[in-house]
Amino acid sequence: QLTVEKSAQWGCIHVKTDSVMPVPRFEIILTSVGSVEFYETYSIGQIATSLFEANRILGEMPEYKKPKTSTLPQNSSNQNYIVEEGANSTEPEEDVVEINNPLFDVLMSFTSQFDENGNLINPTYCQIGYCAKADSATLVHYLQLDAISRLFPGSLVFAWMNSGRDNMYEIIALKTDRGLPAMTGENIVSAKMVQNSGNHEVQIEFNSEGANNWASLTRHNIDKSLAMVIDGNLVTYPRVMSEITGGKASISGNFSIEEASDMSLILGSGALPLKLRVVKNE
């Protein structure tokens, strides 16, 4: 239970709770705006050619080329080689250039999605690859270069999601409608945490308008993924198996019980018109 009181200080309120929830977790819930957005996605098959072209262009840019690697032994520059006249000799090999893959060096596992014949294993999958958090700034820089960004549709936005792997992001290609999502969470009327086969999920329910919009959105995206973004953070991108009617949907994503519980609180409360900031806790 929450108790909200007006503060004597302008622009401030006091929020009290009888929960034993840790303060950092409570502050995250309290300061969440609760903005929910649903996006269609691009499949890897739709943008694979653009990614290969981006990697090629980056590899030809002088600032991203790898240095040449010599085939001579290390420290050979001060050695003298004497060959008898008429003896078989091997001409010094020319320097070779190391294979240059600037984009795929940081966008990992993309190329592993192709079989030995160069065909995509799952062309409808929307996950583009993984990126180490330490390399994320480099990947963002590459994708924002004019020569690279123009290769992709104007409606495409690359989104980042914490993966189950340590210090790694999953990279997903979102499809926007002139920068906007396909649907928002304004028609969500309730949200609750449920357990399904031992997994923690969040079940949401829409009003009649939202139910109709959700049915239409899922009907047009069968065998594709829909991404859910909360407060600007990608949280899941489930694959749509069939049209979903009835105004209900389950959100799954390997959530812990705390994550699923917090998400249900945020979604069930609706979006706030402004973002709160904690100035003091007691």
Regions found by a protein language model. Give the residues of each.
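Non-transmembrane, solvent-exposed regions of membrane trafficking/translocation machinery
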Residues: 1-231, 235-239
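Extended, hydrophilic extramembrane loops/domains of integral membrane proteins
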Residues: 230-231, 238, 245-281
